[in-house]
Amino acid sequence: MSSGSLGQGISAAVGMAITAKLSGDDYRVYTLVGDGEIQEGQVWEASMLAAHRKLDNLVVIVDNNNLQIDGAITEVNSPYPIDKKFEAFNFHVINIDGNDFDQIDAAFKEAKTVKGQPTAIIAKTVKGKGVSFMENQVGWHGKAPNDEEYKIAMEELEKAGEALCQK
């Protein structure tokens, strides 16, 4: 589902996780939030409820790239340290390099073993990773490349994908 306005995705995910618990279903709910998005109070209200309800079927992935539409997170309204905030809300926290597929895989496997509390995976990422002119550039937030930029980006991503397949 589209999460709508900032902060609403985690609230919907908490509702889905509660529904699974109440209905006796064993599915897991995953939601992705940005480090800019977690400045929204609704995120922390939902997190508090998730921990209170011991939603061990909920995994919150935080895309921690230090950039949001208005600029660097640290210059706009810093939520750091993100991991400590989720720990304070009684989440099991896993810090990873969000651009490392092996670490991502390991984090999801670990999250499945957690009992009695929700999990937050704090994924340190590079915005625009793999495209030289987009990496760590806040100006690409919500902006589409032109035809030439698209061609260059796809060539760079294809090379990166080939390198991953050879790993």
Give the label of every model feature segment:
Residues 1-167:
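Glycine-rich ThDP/TPP pyrophosphate-binding loop and its adjacent helix/strand module
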